[in-house]
Every structure is written in C-alpha cells, then in structure tokens.
Amino acid sequence: MLRYCAEHGARLFLDECFLDLSDDGVSMKDCLHDWPQLLILKAFTKSYGMAGIRLGYCLCADGALLGEMAKSTQPWNVSSLAQAAGVAALKEQAFLQQTRALIRTERQWLMGELAALGFRVCPSKANFLLLHGPEDLHQALARRGIAIRRCGNYYGLDNGWYRIAVRRHEENEILVAAMKQACAGR
C-alpha cells in the first residue's frame, strides 16, 4: 500500500490509536523515514483512558508537510495540563503491559461466554469484539442501560453486527448477564 501511495503521489494515513492495547501490535513508525508519505496517528484517548483531555499526535517524516500542518493549528491548541498528562502517561509502560494482560484475559472469557450464548464472535487481538446477533440486540441492551456500537453502516456488514468493548471482569459479567436476558426474551 505504501508503494502504491508513493507511485501515485498519495499519502497513507494510519490510525494506530488502538495499537498499544492489542496483542502483537506492530507499529509502522520504523517505516517513516523510508516512506515520507506515511502519517501515523497516535492518541492517549484509548490506551490511557484520557478521553476528556483530547490529546494525540501525528508522526511523519515529511518536514514540509509538518510545517504546513503547524501553520493551520491554533497557537494554544494543547494546554500545559494536557501536555504534562501526556508526558506522564508515556512513562507508564508497566500500566500498558498490565492493561494488555487484562484485556487478553477478559477478551478470551468474553468470547467464550458470547459464543456459548450463540453469538458469532470474530477473532480479535484488540480491546473490542465484533459479533453478530439479533438485529434488535442494541435496543434490548439499551433498555438495560447498556450501549453497544451498531456496525450495520460498516461496508459489508448488516444490522446484526455489533462492536463491544472488552472491559473489567465485573463490567463484562454485567454485559453477559444482560445479553442472556435479551436473548431469553426472544
């Protein structure tokens, strides 16, 4: 894909925001200097649970492009508090390792529970699962105070596809119990 972009004067924008939470994730950052048309987006929102701070960054080896991007940003676009939080978060590699281990354990448990309920669950190495179930599953769960991501607007998927987050065990148990209730009421 990078070669194609280079041959056609296009840029490849790669979102690595979930990469730190995935098993065996391999960043493309080592390719930046060989492929100047590559831009990599990283964010603290997913890996560090810092959604309210809205902090992220872009990696790119094209100095001219970075200069143009800098011209279009506001002078004070990132607060000093957000910068300090980002620097502190990057030092917490042990936190990421613990989080990945938790996700790995909970993902396996959740996949087994959902498969036992009859859901088609796609293999995953990330902190979320893609599954197929009843088209009204989101409504049944919403009545129980649980929101899941409908994926019927994703290319190639219909209204029975959903994405759920892998969370702490107690939260995953609540989700599974609600899904059991939703399926039992059919």
Language model feature labels by segment:
Residues 1-12, 16-47:
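Active-site pre-lysine segment of PLP-dependent enzymes
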Residues 37-115, 119-120:
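PLP-dependent aminotransferase class I/II
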Residues 52, 125, 156-158:
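Short acidic/glycine-enriched loop/turn segments that link adjacent beta-strands
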Residues 60, 131-133, 166-168:
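Short beta-strand-to-loop capping motifs
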Residues 104, 108, 112-145:
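Conserved PLP-binding catalytic core of the aspartate aminotransferase-like
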Residues 143-144, 153-186:
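PLP-dependent enzyme catalytic core of the Aspartate aminotransferase-like
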